[in-house]
Amino acid sequence: MRVLVLGSGVIGTTSAYYLARAGFQVTVVDRQPAAAMETSFANAGQVSPGYASPWAAPGVPLKALKWLLQRHAPLAIKATADIDQYLWMAQMLRNCTASRYAINKERMVRLSEYSRDCLDELRLETGIAYEGRSLGTTQLFRTQAQLDNAAKDIAVLEQSGVPYELLDRDGIARVEPALAGVTGILSGALRLPNDQTGDCQLFTTRLAEMAVALGVEFRYGQNIERLDHAGDRINGVWIDGKLETADRYVLALGSYSPQLLKPLGIKAPVYPLKGYSLTVPITNPDMAPTSTILDETYKVAITRFDNRIRVGGMAEIAGFDLSLNPRRRETLEMIVGDLYPQGGDLTQADFWTGLRPTTPDGTPIVGATPFRNLFLNTGHGTLGWTMACGSGRLLADLIARKTPRISAEGLDISRYGNTQENAQHVHPAPAHQ
C-alpha cells in the first residue's frame, strides 16, 4: 500500500519512518531542499513530556495584557488582516479555564510520555545519535508566586505518574552547577528527571537517512499545490502541476496544513506561533548548562548540546512573517547572559526564527479525517520534537489498523466538529488548470 506524506519536518519524517517499518511504500514530498529545514531546524532542543502544557491556561488572558506592555515579554501580538488569527485567539481564550486546561494537559502529557518512550526504543534499536542527553529538565522560578502556581501542574504530573522533584536553591546548584552563582535571583525550581534533550534537526536528518534505507523516497524542492478530492476520498495531490496518487495521504505541513484543508471543508485551527532561538558556541563547559532549564518568567528554554547552547522561546502571533526581530535577540541574549554569563560567546551566536503550528487547545491533531484515506499529523506547537516519535508511531498504527499502545482519545480533528457530513457537502475540486 502506497502512502504519500506531505512534509519532511520532524513530524513528517517520523511518520514516514514508522509507516515504512509497518510495511508501507512511502514517499515524502517537501518544498525545501532537505529534511527539517523549517520549524524543526533550530528549536529549543528539549524533549520534555512533563512540561507539555497548553498556552491556553487560567490567568493567561490577564498575563497577556501585561506582557503587551513589557519589552522582554514572552508573548507578543502583531495585528494582521487575517481573520483566522482572530478566530484562533478567540478559541484559545475559550480554553483558558481550569477544566479545559486539565483536559488538554492530560492529552498532551499522554502523547508526550509515549513519544519519549518511543524515542528511547528507537535509540536503542538503531543507535541514532543527535547530541542527546537524558539528564532531565529544570524549571526555574524567579518568584514565590511562580513556585506556588506550579501546584496545578504537579497535580497533573502525579495523576499521570510523572516523577518530579521540587528544588530549593541548593538543589538547583546541585543539578545545574553553573547556576550556583545566580541562585540568589531564584525562588526554587521544579525538576523532571526523565526529560531529555537533543538536536532536532540532526535527529530528523539522520532518521530520514534511515527511512531511505527502509525504502522511503524523499522528493525535495517540490511545490505542493492542493488536494484533489471526490466524495469522501482524496484522489491525489497536485504537485508542480502533476497529480500524484497514493492509497493513503498524510498531511504533516505544520502551520501550512489549513491552507490545503480549508477547500475540503475541514476546520483545522492551526495557526503559527513565531518563535526564536540563539545557538551559542560554548567557551567554558563548566559554566554552561548540564541539560535543559526553563525560565518560567520569560518562557525561554536554555539547552546544552555537545559544544553549543541553544536558547529558544518567545511567541509572536504575527501570521506567517519570518523576519528576524532584533528585540527578540536582545531578550534571548539578556536571559542567557543573566543565568550563564560565562558559558558561551554571544558575539558568535546564530539567530533564527520559525513558525510553530499551534492549536488553540495546545493538543496536536493526529489521526483520521472525514476523508477515508486522509490522515493528519500537525499542530504540535512548541512540542513537535517532544511528541514526534509518539505521533508518528501512533499514526502508523492507525493507518495500519492496529490498536495503538496509548489511547488516541481527543487527538484527532473530530474534536473541532469535523464530521463525515462536512466532507460530503464539499464539492469536488475543479480540474487542474
From Swiss-Prot:
Annotated residues that bind FAD are located at: 3-17
**What parts of the sequence cross the membrane?**
none
Q: Which SUPFAM superfamilies match?
A: FAD-linked reductases, C-terminal domain, FAD/NAD(P)-binding domain
Q: Which UniProt keywords apply?
A: FAD, Flavoprotein, Oxidoreductase
Q: Which Pfam families match?
A: DAO (PF01266)
The keyword Oxidoreductase belongs to this UniProt entry's keyword annotation: yes
Pathway field: Amino-acid degradation; D-alanine degradation; NH(3) and pyruvate from D-alanine: step 1/1
Record-linked InterPro entries: DadA, FAD-dep_OxRdtase, FAD/NAD-bd_sf
Q: Name one GO molecular function term.
A: D-amino-acid dehydrogenase activity
EC top class, in one word? Answer: oxidoreductase
Q: What is its EC number?
A: 1.4.99.-
List the GO cellular component terms. Answer: cytoplasm; plasma membrane
- Which Gene Ontology biological process is one annotated for this entry? D-alanine catabolic process
Highest taxon of the lineage: Bacteria
Entry's family note = Belongs to the DadA oxidoreductase family.
Q: Briefly, what is this protein's role?
A: Oxidative deamination of D-amino acids.
Name of this chain's protein: D-amino acid dehydrogenase
Q: What is the originating organism of this protein?
A: Pseudomonas syringae pv. syringae (strain B728a)
Which taxonomic lineage is given here? Bacteria, Pseudomonadati, Pseudomonadota, Gammaproteobacteria, Pseudomonadales
